[in-house]
């Protein structure tokens, strides 16, 4: 399934990458993946709960489109 670049909640985006697990666990896995890459590490520690389209675009380019 091709996802579009738009604003995503962090749990929502995590569920896109890991649909078979609970949202909280999916977020922990996505956060770990984001922390492993210097381009996306700052996104993992944001205090807000949404990713803007530009941030989603960076995540998709680094991790691949789910």
Q: Can you say where each PLM-predicted feature lies in the sequence?
A:
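A short, Lys/Arg-enriched interface patch at domain edges and termini
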Residues: 53-66
């Amino acid at each position: 399934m091709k996802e579009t670049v738009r604003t995503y909640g962090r749990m929502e985006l995590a569920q896109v990458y890991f649909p078979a697990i609970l949202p909280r666990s999916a977020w922990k896995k996505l956060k770990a993946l984001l922390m492993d890459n210097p381009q996306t590490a700052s996104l993992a520690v944001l205090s807000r709960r949404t990713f803007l389209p530009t941030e989603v675009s960076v995540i998709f380019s680094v991790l691949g489109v789910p």
